Amino acid sequence: MLSDAEIEEGKRNTSYSLKQEEPLHEHNDCVRIAYEWLDAQAKTKGVTRKARALKHIIEQWGGRYVSTSDVDVAATLHPDIHGTYPFFNISSRLTRPNKRRLNGVTQAFTQSYVESDGLADYKTDET
C-alpha cells in the first residue's frame, strides 16, 4: 500500500490534467483507491483513445469521492501507467477489481457511492 510520504511526493511530481483548477485532494486514501483500481486494469502498449469518466467508475468501486487530481497522482505513482487522464494505457475492457484491494484503506466505502448493477462498466471481475 502506498505510504503518505509516497503520495505527497507524487502530488509534487504530478502534471495535473485539469490545468485551470487547483488540485483537489480530500484524503490520501482517495489516491490509494484510484491506484488500486488502476493496478487491476490490463495494460496496453498505447493509450486508449476513448474518453471515459474513470473517476466516477473508481468512486463507485471504492465507495468514496475521488477527484480527477487523485487519479492523476495515482497514475503518476504507478510504474506501469502512462498517459493523461482519461487517456491511460489501460484496456477498454475494464476489470472490476476485487474489493480485497481496499483492505486497510480506511476511507473506502465511507460515502454513499454505489456500483451500478452487473458488469455495465466492466468486462470481467478480478478474482
For every predicted segment, state its role.
Residues S3-E26, T76-Y122:
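Charged low-complexity interaction tracts in eukaryotic proteins
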Residues K45, R49-A51, W61, S69, ...:
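Membrane-helix boundary/juxtamembrane interface motif
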